[in-house]
Amino acid sequence: LAVRRTLETVYENYRGDRSAAEWKALEKYLKKVWFANGIHHHYSNDKFVPGFTEGYLLDVIETIPEEKFGDLNPLRGEVCKAIFDPALYPTKLNQKAGDDLLLTSSSNYYHNVSQAEAEAFYADMAAADAGNPEPVSYGLNSQLTKDDAGRICERVWKLGGMYSPAIERIVYWLEKAQAVAKEPQKTNIAALVSYYKTGDLKEFDRYNIGWVKDTVSNVDFVNGFIEDYGDPLGRKASWEANVNFMDTEACHRTEVISDNAQWFEDHSPVAEAYRKPVVRGVSAKVITVAMLGGDCYPATPIGINLPNADWIRKEYGSKSVTIDNITYAYDMAAHGNGFNEE
């Protein structure tokens, strides 16, 4: 965030030559940061290489009044190191065998904790809940760190916990929606609000069960710490949200397929041992997304297949959703031969 805010302040306040090659390179770098939500590529996870020098950035900053940067001023050295030091934060997500995946990755999900310590911490947590047919997704909504005594602990993302100011705004708008929602969404939103207030993952499961069972609401949404792609251990999730409405005509076509899900399962080209004898709760629809936020923006998925908890999928099914307007936009963007019009 310090990198982004510093570059945004420069972008908004620089009054020098904006036609210079280094300025164009700085502008391009900032756009990459915007698109990837950070200094690493959103797919390859490699760190961006700036096409401008540290000296140029500092010279540009010197032309802008200090008060424009506010609390960013003391962080200038750290910002420059983050951008220009290739050995610092070289990759967002390292999955190389033999490396400590946490100490060599650049996410904020773990702080001062090794891979072995994290794996042992969650193994103990799972062992204490062994035999539970409905286990929560341990660690999904927290940062793993150490307290002042050196003991490993979780900083839970909830009201009054880590990221509380942002979560307060999420809760505020969810409660606004709850006040005008109809059932079953009113009850589902209440469970989600309870989850954000308490950090209790059982409440998140309750919300997910209600959400996947709701196949009648024309307007639907996804909201929460959902996907764990950014965690090298595949445990902690990034926040995302969208609001969408059904494409009725396209939904009819997908319903024909989902209504015959058992036939497709019975005739799938896999060994019989891997086929489900009874397919449960397959809900497929086509939606138009009206709002995107968090980790699903601006690099947007073309579909949704949730929830992720295996036991919920087994007992209650899942929602498989195609996002029609995003699919269309990607298709239109792919047209052409790759050359500029000129």
Q: Each PLM stretch: what is its role?
A:
Residues 11, 15-341:
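Contiguous, non-catalytic segments that form substrate-binding/exosite surfaces or channel walls
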